[in-house]
Amino acid sequence: EYFLSPLEPIPSEERIHFTKPDLCLLLAIGILYSCFALYDLGDRKAPTTTYDMSGELQAIELEFPEDALPVTMASYLAPWHQRHFGMDVKSNAEDSWTYLGEIILNNVFTWQDVSLQDLLTQATENSTSDMSATTRYLRLSLTDNDASLIELVFLDANGNITRPLNADAYPTLFDESDLYPERYSFRNSMYFDEIYHARTAYEFLHGLPTYENTHPPLGKIFIALGVAIFGMNPFGWRIMGTLFGIAMLPFIYLLGKKMTRNTPAAALACFLF
């Protein structure tokens, strides 16, 4: 009669001990990373009120003070990009409009400039007759189906903001000029793939057709959560990704400890991450 010999017990994998030095190193790395990640993440305020335009050839007509004619137009638009406008100017109310050319407002939630002086100079050079028009009166005519302008800011030759005399006719277009930045940067504008993902998060919140649909939506839903809490500004659309980055550090540390079974090696792996 044969008897089966008892099976030899298989030793379980040695348990990894998370020691006090591990905790101290992880906390130190987490605090250090958090300070760098959260510092100067972006402005907490940005223009939000919109002036919506629909239907081709819808126009905005503006009048400026004679002693503060605009030479630069700064724009901040969303949610649609690459909006096409025709620009016309004239010196007096009774004059005919002089066409300067087409301008394209490109990226969303991004400050961008259009040089009115360059357009005026180019139009003068291309004109077959004497042209004496100035930017005292300015007209922007939409040539796309839809556009939504969040803010327009006009600057005179000294770089000072010049407000249209009839700005009250477009109350949501000139109500947040105090948020116009002295210098355009990541602090006040989108950069890299934010023009896709943060924009789509905004569209989620407002029930709009989504522009970016090639990536799974979960990450953009988290971005939308940050926007819902902190507003549609650089801080709002970046904070959730930053917090998730901080939350990943313990998992990276534990993975390094499991693979190396060594505290300094785990700390180095987490730090390099």
How would you name each of these model-derived features?
Residues 2-20:
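Membrane-interfacial, low-structure loops and terminal tails that flank and connect transmembrane helices
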Residues 22-36, 171-173:
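Alpha-helical transmembrane segments
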Residues 36-110, 116-186:
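Aromatic, loop-rich ligand-recognition surfaces of beta-strand-rich domains
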Residues 45-50, 165-180, 186-198, 210-222, ...:
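Extracytoplasmic catalytic/substrate-binding loops of multi-pass membrane glycan-assembly enzymes
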Residues 235, 239-260:
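Transmembrane-helix motifs of polytopic, lipid-linked glycan transferases
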Residues 266-273:
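Short helix- or helix-capping micro-motifs
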